[in-house]
Amino acid sequence: MYYELSHQKQKLFTMKKLFFLFICLILIQCQKSNPEKTSTRWSEEKIWNWYNNHPWLVGTNFITSSSINQLEFWQEETFDPELIEKELKLSASIGMNTHRVFLHDLLWEQDSIGFLDRIDKFLEISDRNGIKTLLVFFDDVWHPVPNMGKQPEPIPHVHNSGWVQSPGAKILYDSLSHNKLESYIKGVVTKFADDSRILAWDLYNEAGAEGIASHDISKERAIELYEKIGIEITDDNYSSYNLNDIDPKSIKKTYTLSLLKKTVEWVRESNPSQPITTGIYAWDIDWAPLSDLSELDQFIINSSDIISFHSYGSKKDVLERLKQLKNYNRPLLCTEYIARENKSTFEDVLPIFKENKIGAYNWGLVSGKTNTIYPWKSWDSTYTAPPNKWHHDIFYQNGEPFSNDEIELIKNLTSQANK
């Protein structure tokens, strides 16, 4: 009897999933056959009107302290509404009103209905705490071989040892596989296209990223690090951990640009009421004039309704970046900052963002399994205890701040801006 009921339940779930995917395909076909419903890049007037109707936007790149990566955050078995509520309340208590949150294509592939339900639940909790959400679809940073199921334990004292790319290298480096992602993008955007709880859509984090710390370690260092979480690397299996070979930076931008172009089309065809963006981030180039940028960066700027960027540099660097980006005459969001040892601090940077009404999303809220209190160099330098200056993050898990002075500064700036 138990087997029969279980079998019937599984059959019903499969039928529901197939029905939902069928509806998505109908919507996709309707959009393709009705080109007048396809949106285009927002005009400068439209995006400025939209932006000026919002308060100063301040928040974090949010993930619960119990999650090592996007998959652990969103999977049904580890999705934790109570902890989300607790940690979002903490951010709201210091005046934060928005968060940037990463999705993953594998979550859609495994259980699209459940994934959408969990996104909806997250948005419900966020809205209850006065927080709007910037959702991120794809990410070119950290581990290129994501897998569903139980996620690895953090490598002790190592920055972001479990974060995963989306899509993984298997799909990214096979252009013919890119179209498999269309239902993911259109399914999510169509579901929430008119949802005021979503601030905007961030299509691709650090598109074409190179120089990732996890990729540049030696074989000996890889053996040492992975041994700490019970993974033995040998000559026979090293190819599975040689990330530079799996994720070759020499050709990555070509494949990323191909996927990003398709993603922009898919989102525009879904005609969301929210604007879209993809961030510019390369630290070793100027970001203007446009003609000097790579083909990928030119496309990023030209396809974004609102310009977003990452800045982990000093006050001087931020001011120079703002000068360059103001050439594009669109509102600005800094979607990643804070690297205290790198002179990217709340004290130096956040007042600049407030003065210029630039949206500000620091990396990390509550210190946890991502280990982002440790710097990037922890991949190649041994730490045995937390650094005196945290790299990212604001709070301990008990709700105590890393720095009382930082908390007072954030509170003062957000309260002044939103009077």
Language-model segments: what does each one mean?
Residues 1-15:
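N-terminal secretory signal peptides that target proteins for export/translocation
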Residues 16-21:
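Sec-dependent signal peptide recognition
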Residues 28-29:
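C-terminal motif of bacterial Sec signal peptides marking the signal peptidase cleavage site
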Residues 37-304, 315-317, 328, 337, ...:
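Active-site mouth of glycoside hydrolases
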Residues 331-333:
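Catalytic His-Asp charge-relay segment
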